[in-house]
Amino acid sequence: MQHPILVIGHRQGIGRAIAEQLCQAGHTVLGVSREAVDYQHSHLTSLTFAAEDLTVEHLPETLSGVVYAPGSINLKPFKSLKPADFLADFHINALGATHVLQVAEKALKAGQGSVLLFSTVAVSQGMPFHASIAMAKGAVEGLARSLAAEWAPHVRVNCIAPSLTDTPLAAKLLGNEARAATAAERHPLKRVGTVADIAEISCTLLRSTWISGEVIGVNGGMGRLRTA
């Protein structure tokens, strides 16, 4: 990947892990986050503003890839969800990605680039209290497949659908040993995911030149396996 890779949401969590792994591999990364990052690397240029404020002027003429990592975990009983909840989840997950990709389309096509979006295992596996986020992430999966077809053969577009991953966003769900143990037990591989797990497959998908239109489950076996 000889041109810069745009990573949206590189301050923490999965986005940070991807940005750091790309930099360590020698790739040039342009990171965008709402808040300033607390790390530096010679291959990293960080911009501090919301993804919705991204413009063509912020980008190089050519990109090797775009990673859209922002997300939300808004778990509520269906009867408690308000229209604002659905709109907030859709805005950050689906519309945010849409804006970034519309801005980056020309640079991606110039670089024969790769796009990586993020869904959740809850789209394919029915889970209580996930109605809002599953709807929003389902839209992300549809976006990934549609753009993979529309932008072929110039740009590859893929999506990762993780299960629960140990990130700041998931801190409330993994806030003590009991909760963490319960979460781990739900997975056939008996642990929750790490940002390193997600970053590893993310970088593979960004590099691959013959994978497109796929939603890849990285979920400790939760998506396919039943062990009890």
Label each residue range with its predicted role:
Residues 11, 15, 19:
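N-terminal Rossmann NAD(P)H-binding glycine-rich loop of SDR-like oxidoreductase domains
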Residues 67-75, 221:
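Conserved NAD(P)H cofactor-binding loop of Rossmann-fold oxidoreductase domains
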Residues 112-139, 144-152, 164-165:
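Catalytic loop of short-chain dehydrogenase/reductase
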Residues 141, 151-165, 211-218:
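Conserved Rossmann-fold SDR core element
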Residues 164-186, 225-228:
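A glycine/serine/threonine-rich, flexible loop-to-helix segment
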Residues 192-218, 223:
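C-terminal substrate-recognition "lid" of short-chain dehydrogenase/reductases
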